[in-house]
Amino acid sequence: FHNFTLLHDDIMDNAAVRRGKPSVYARWGGNVAILSGDAMLISAYRLLAQAPPALLPRILEVFNTMALGVCEGQQYDMDFESKQKVSVVEYMSMIELKTSVLVAGSAMMGAILGGADEEQSRRLYQFAIELGMAFQLQDDLLDSYGGEELGKTIGGDILEGKKSYLMVTAMSRADEEQREVLRHTYKDAALAPAEKIARVRAVFDALDVPRLTEQQISLRFDRALATLDGLNVPDARKEPLREYARSLMGRRK
């Protein structure tokens, strides 16, 4: 399911690179990317159908809610591209749907299949919500300040005019002169890519946006681990999830 979302996301974003290699969309075109994504979604349902019959209705309920949430979040993300003003609250709501719900729904399905009760399942869901938020905020930060070894085009969000967490935070803190620099730079199609990235990052730096983003990442990650710690199961059973969280957040510049 995740790869299905990425294939379709690359079409909507006109993304040339995915995981350090040409995207399916860039290499084989939109039609192949659409059909490949559709096939992956169907394959996901085929795998879900193997769940124990007694649990299948609940599993499908969680999966379908998750899938609809991801689609809703993607629509918000696209809407933000043409929206003049996006608040930090609106942005956080969008990434919860687009990213966190995917991680959280997966965690909840695993909990249900593993025999967890409702309280345990809900706690694992919340753990994954916070972890997904931390991951997406870090992804935004690394897009502008990370290294190309991560498989992303550096400054891709800036060049595409996307309203990342860094951008909406900067706009919320900037004075009118700084806002105008950001607006003009984002819209200036004639500006060389390197210069566009440098100008936007200069405003981000002046407003302390990278540090503030790091703070928010740490806050969400700490909340995730605290939620996991509160789960009433032996610690040894929680350690694989801690390892997963650390590996997910292990990407750094």
Predicted features along the sequence, with ranges:
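All-alpha prenyltransferase/terpene-synthase fold signal
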Residues: F1-K253
